[in-house]
Amino acid sequence: MRFSVLLTGIAAAGSLAAAERSCGAVPPRAYEQEFTQALSSLTAEAASADLTAGITIDTYLHVLTDGQNGNISDQQLQAQISAMNQHYGQAGVQFRLVRATRTNNANWASGRDEAGMKRALHQGTYSTLNIYFIPNLSSGLLGICYFPRANPSQTTITMDGCMVRSGTVPGGSTTNYNQGKTATHEVGHFLGLYHVFSENGSCADADMVADTPAQSKKTSGCPSSQDSCPGGGVDSIHNYMDYSYDVCMNQFTRGQAARIAQAWRAFRAGH
């Protein structure tokens, strides 16, 4: 999943100003079918799992720099893990930082040679989270992450994980998106969550989660309210899987927590 910003310029203090986010990719077409098939093979207990499940994910953070850009302090890395643990606490998920790596490579720091970078740096298995912090993702992207797949090949495992713009960590330089919630959003895709809004402007059930109201458009900024599909409840402007400013995001639903637990058992647990 690609998560991007439309750049409006550089602020006086050197911060990266971002107008809004937009998505440049969609989940693999086979994902929902694979999810449904995998869910049908789970036990009734596992299939009904919810936010009480308790999932702990070993996590590796990789900091890419080009000699000048991309530096992230140890304190900011720990703050990112703490932020994710706070955000996902309501969904029963915690992240255990195993190790952080630092690599100075101008090519990788520009978002190029993703495969080469991941072959060199990826750690763990399909149940391990790797986040690559990159200062210059292409086309203004804030992040890219991969949905889980059934029966992953070794190449799929190596290419797994999330690439996130360095300036979005807590205290980072990306204005309106520097509370660590871009990583939280991207990891939602790693855990099997869709966006809460429709990708085609319809009021269909875009994310396959019953307790997120139908929403025909992404949220920009932090409005006081938004109701793009009247009759089913107001838009999920505070949900981590929308496109609001970081300050606006503070919620996963019980339905999303259940889907995370189900997808974890179907695709990642034990792999």
UniProtKB/Swiss-Prot annotation:
Function: Secreted metalloproteinase that allows assimilation of proteinaceous substrates. Plays a pivotal role as a pathogenicity determinant during infections and contributes to the ability of the pathogen to persist within the mammalian host.
Family: Belongs to the peptidase M43B family.
Signal peptide extent: 1-19
Origin: domain of life: Eukaryota
Residues that bind Zn(2+): 185, 189
Source organism per UniProt: Arthroderma gypseum (strain ATCC MYA-4604 / CBS 118893) (Microsporum gypseum)
The name this protein goes by in its record: Extracellular metalloprotease MGYG_07913
InterPro entries: MetalloPept_cat_dom_sf, Peptidase_M43
Family annotation (Gene3D superfamilies): Collagenase (Catalytic Domain)
EC number: 3.4.24.-
Gene Ontology CC terms: extracellular region
Enzyme kind, highest EC tier: hydrolase
Pfam families reported in the protein's UniProt record: Peptidase_M43
Keywords assigned by UniProt, alphabetized: Disulfide bond, Glycoprotein, Hydrolase, Metal-binding, Metalloprotease, Protease, Secreted, Signal, Virulence, Zinc
Disulfide bond listed as a keyword: yes
